[in-house]
Structure formats: C-alpha cells, structure tokens
Amino acid sequence: TFLYNKWQINIFSNISSSEQTHMDAILLLLNKYNLLDPVANNFAGVFANGTLQNLYNQLTTQGSASSLDALKVGATIEDLDIYDLKTALTKVDNQDIRLVYENLMKGSRNHLRSFYSNILVAGGTYTPQFITQAEFDAIIDSPMETGK
C-alpha cells in the first residue's frame, strides 16, 4: 500500500493482506449474484468514483506528513468503513450480504483497535470522524473479534 511503502510500518502491510481477504469476500458475492466487479480493472489508488478518488488523494496526502499521521489515516479509514457498513446493513435484507458485511465490520473494528494501539504507542491520540465517540470507546474497550 501507499502508506506502507512510504513509512514501512508493519501494520499497513498486515492490514493490506486482510483487506485483500475482504475484497475476495465481496468478489464471491458479486460472482454468486452474477454482478460485474466495479473495480476489476482498477490499479491501486485509482477509483472510478470521484468522491472516493478525492478521499484517497486527501488521506494519502495527510498520511505522507508523518508516520503518526499515517496511523491516524489508517484509523480514519477503518472508522469510515465501520460507519459505511453500519449504514449499508440498515438497507440490506439478503442474508449472504448481511453475513459478509457483518464479518467485514468485525475486521474493521479489529483494524481500528490495532491502529489506535499503534497511535498510542507513537504518542498520539485519535478522535473518531464518522462513528460516535461512544461507539469508538466501545470498540476500543472490547477484545479482538473473530469471523464466522
């Protein structure tokens, strides 16, 4: 990933591998329901959706400032993922999709815990940008989760 290449912090490499597993889970759903993969031909860091491209550009710029800023960007991405998945779950009744989203959310909560721990070790703090402070605190104060 961009931030791993910039800072060589292991958490970025570890989570990148996990994120590939998440992408594979979504691809299984796309294949099962005969849907086109909207990112099949995209290179890393390239998004057809302008909003996502702008967010990527903004976050990579922020994460390039310092290794601590990079860790905060990692936490922000997981924070946003949790928010987006929670929102998506309110609109989905297909049990296959719900199961994948719920497992993705577990992964994102675990990643948020890991990034936050690294932020603290680096002497920083993190304030959630998308989920509430109460949700963030509940995640941070709970143990790592496993998938189904």
Regions found by a protein language model. Give the residues of each.
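All-alpha RGS (Regulator of G-protein Signaling) helical domain and cognate RGS-like helical scaffolds
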Residues: T1-K148
